[in-house]
């Protein structure tokens, strides 16, 4: 699911922490500084290549490169389909619980490699194997799977799309009229995703040679994925992959069985191990407890240590200090008659202060990446426009040596062209269909809003893709938030501005995100000798799979769990209410905020910028200990229970690294992926049991001594 410009690796850390910001392609298995272990290996490979003696492609020189059609095999897409379902369920669960989605690249790559190896071994045994499993086919699988489960993230099921629903709207008193509400339905969701998810794939296709070959943008995540795949297809890499899959399977089984065991004790609200007051009843009341979730222990093992510590610090600051103090102001700062879930009461402080932190962090990183992108682009243009001149004034022949790897990769990358007419014509055609069709789904979203979005989208997509190539940051969610404010304010409250803002966010995020993702895939394909055509086709097929699979998975959750999206439940969908309230702010302004809430928002907005600035200016040894504002913002709204899970995960990883660093780097991502996948897949049978009205037989609940005495007295009477 990074070699960042700042020494602290902060950019990668920030991307690990918000569902709308964290990209699934960024850095699987990062160390304490936020640098992916895959990327460290990729960097080492790059350094070795520059030195000369080490060459990746010389190791594969005796293996024929299949044509782009041969890279697109039936078995690749069959395996991709089933893996896409599995990872879509996992991402959907993460989306609807806390919104923290770690990179699942390692598990996707491992399982794709393992299942096709299994397939080919079985066919080879009966003598029917026609085509061996190649790294190009492996790249096709990886691209297809990540594109498919990426829709579960970028489709907005935990953010803008679900934020339109009545469930989320009725938690606020503003803009909850029919004009600003649209309840989920599988039909229009699939249609919407098909309309907005493909146009981004066409936006930057003509620029792939410029971005990958001419500018030689690094795309660290794409490079890391390619290095992983190249490693699988060496004898040593295949042996390690087999061991990693074994560890993943072991912890997958443990996590799945544990989820099944826990289910027996959840017969009512507040029952089961997930409501265990491990730190005491008062701490439990303030959402400090360990909920025995393998998922977030696994997430903690994948996320950098600073992310996990930042989340815990955010929980302590908010639920340990701020909210109890503000609760004491009940009757003064807000009406005593209001419930804690009212946005005019304590809940308003929780939601809007977290929004202030997210926006401050997002604005800072947007400006920083924009400056770096512009500076890098200017330097690149100057470099390319300078003509070397000899002493007599005539042009010199370039003497820069091209390595064997670069020469071979460039030759094959430029071999299979994607016609520009397909890209330009496809963009115009899909845009025209979207402009005509989207207003049928959202009548409030006028055709000229969509036209304006599509006119500016390619420019923004280029900025995002170029920035991601330099820094590995994808700011798709930031562009989406800008769309919320711009289009929401343009439409106005009386014309369904909240719904317009959320829908425009989806349009903009989908274009900008998929364009950047495709360029990452082209970089992976470039480094594994996979054809750009096969990469493009795989991305299109994966996106089409995701447009059907993701809404179906969400619909399963939506129908199986009645309280989805409600604060304090198993699936609170925290970012759905955050995004909706951003849209309300864009339309109505700050008039609805509780007393002193705006002042606190200003303080935390400024604090987010100041903390980020301190991280960038401080020496790397100091910067890596400065917390991340985006990570701190997450528990402000939903509580600290998952922060404790993640902290336990980071402690396990830290101790493992102290005992045996090499083994931890090799197997920790696989163990973490097993914990996440097993618990995530248990959600599928749990949903089926809920739909079949099969209820758990036992309620395990914890009471204080006084309440227990009252219950005993009541039962005695």
UniProtKB/Swiss-Prot annotation:
Expressed in root cortex and stele. Belongs to the YSL (TC 2.A.67.2) family. This is Probable metal-nicotianamine transporter YSL12. GO terms for molecular function: oligopeptide transmembrane transporter activity. May be involved in the transport of nicotianamine-chelated metals. The keyword Transport applies. It comes from the Eukaryota. It is found in: Membrane. The chain crosses the membrane at residues 76-96, 99-119, 144-164, 186-206, 248-268, 306-326, 351-371, 422-442, 450-470, 482-502, 536-556, 593-613, 636-656, 671-691. Residues 1-56 are annotated as: Disordered. It comes from Oryza sativa subsp. japonica.
């Amino acid at each position: 699911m990074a070699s960042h410009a700042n020494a602290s690796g902060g950019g990668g850390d920030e991307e690990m922490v918000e569902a709308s910001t964290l990209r699934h392609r960024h850095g699987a298995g990062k160390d304490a500084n936020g640098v992916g272990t895959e990327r460290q290996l990729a960097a080492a490979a790059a350094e070795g290549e520059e030195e000369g003696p080490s060459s990746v492609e010389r190791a594969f020189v005796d293996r024929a490169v299949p044509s782009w059609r041969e890279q697109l095999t039936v078995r690749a897409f069959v395996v991709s389909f089933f893996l896409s379902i599995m990872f879509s369920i996992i991402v959907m669960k993460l989306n609807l619980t806390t919104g923290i989605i770690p990179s699942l690249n390692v598990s996707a790559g491992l399982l794709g490699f393992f299942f096709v190896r299994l397939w080919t071994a079985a066919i080879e045994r009966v003598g029917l194997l026609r085509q061996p499993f190649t790294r190009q086919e492996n790249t096709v699988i990886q691209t297809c799977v990540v594109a498919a489960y990426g829709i579960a993230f970028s489709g907005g099921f935990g953010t803008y799309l679900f934020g339109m629903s009545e469930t989320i709207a009725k938690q606020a008193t503003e803009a909850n009229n029919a004009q600003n509400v649209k309840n989920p339905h599988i039909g229009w969701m699939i249609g919407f995703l098909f309309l907005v998810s493909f146009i981004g794939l066409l936006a930057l296709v003509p620029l792939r040679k410029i971005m990958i070959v001419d500018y030689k943008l690094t795309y660290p995540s794409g490079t890391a994925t390619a290095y992983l795949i190249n490693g699988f297809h060496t004898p040593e890499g295949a042996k390690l992959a087999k061991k990693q899959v074994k560890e993943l399977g072991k912890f997958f089984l443990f996590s799945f069985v544990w989820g099944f065991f826990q289910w027996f004790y959840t017969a009512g609200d507040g029952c089961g191990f997930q409501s265990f007051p491990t730190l005491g009843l008062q701490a439990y009341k303030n959402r400090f407890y360990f909920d025995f979730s393998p998922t977030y222990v696994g997430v903690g093992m994948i996320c950098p240590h600073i992310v996990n510590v930042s989340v815990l610090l955010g929980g302590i600051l908010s639920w340990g200090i701020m909210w109890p103090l503000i609760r004491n102001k009940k009757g003064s700062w807000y009406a005593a008659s209001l419930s804690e879930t009212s946005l005019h009461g304590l809940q308003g402080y929780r939601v809007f202060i977290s929004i202030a932190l997210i926006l401050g962090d997002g604005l800072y990183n947007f400006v920083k990446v924009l400056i770096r992108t512009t500076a890098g682009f200017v330097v690149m243009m100057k470099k390319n426009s300078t003509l070397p001149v000899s002493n007599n004034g005539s042009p010199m022949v370039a003497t820069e040596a091209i390595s064997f790897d670069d020469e071979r990769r460039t030759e094959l990358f430029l071999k299979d062209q994607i016609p520009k007419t397909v890209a330009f014509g496809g963009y115009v055609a899909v845009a025209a269909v979207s402009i005509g069709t989207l207003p049928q789904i959202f009548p409030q979203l006028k055709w000229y809003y969509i036209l304006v979005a599509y006119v500016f989208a390619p420019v923004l997509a280029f900025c995002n893709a170029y920035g991601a190539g330099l820094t590995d940051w994808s700011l798709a969610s930031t562009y989406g938030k800008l769309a919320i404010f711009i289009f929401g304010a343009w439409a106005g409250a009386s014309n369904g501005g909240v719904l317009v803002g959320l829908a425009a966010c989806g349009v903009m995020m989908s274009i900008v995100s998929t364009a950047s993702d495709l360029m990452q895939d082209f970089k992976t394909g470039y480094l594994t000798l996979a054809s750009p055509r096969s990469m493009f086709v795989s991305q299109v097929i994966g996106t089409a799979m995701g447009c059907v699979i993701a809404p179906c998975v969400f619909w399963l959750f939506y129908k199986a769990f009645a309280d989805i999206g409600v604060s304090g439940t198993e699936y609170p969908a925290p970012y759905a209410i955050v995004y909706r309230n951003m849209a309300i702010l864009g339309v109505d302004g700050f008039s609805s905020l509780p007393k002193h809430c705006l002042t606190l928002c200003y303080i935390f907005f400024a604090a987010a910028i100041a903390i980020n600035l301190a991280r960038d200016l401080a020496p790397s040894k100091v910067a890596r200990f400065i917390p991340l504002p985006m990570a701190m913002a997450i528990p402000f709204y939903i509580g600290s229970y998952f922060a404790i899970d993640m902290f336990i995960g980071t402690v396990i990883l830290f101790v493992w690294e102290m005992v045996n660093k090499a083994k931890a780097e090799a197997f920790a991502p696989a163990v973490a992926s097993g914990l996440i996948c097993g618990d995530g897949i248990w959600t599928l049978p749990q949903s089926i049991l809920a739909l079949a009205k099969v209820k758990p037989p036992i309620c395990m609940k914890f009471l204080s001594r006084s309440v227990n005495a009252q219950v005993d007295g009541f039962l005695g009477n």
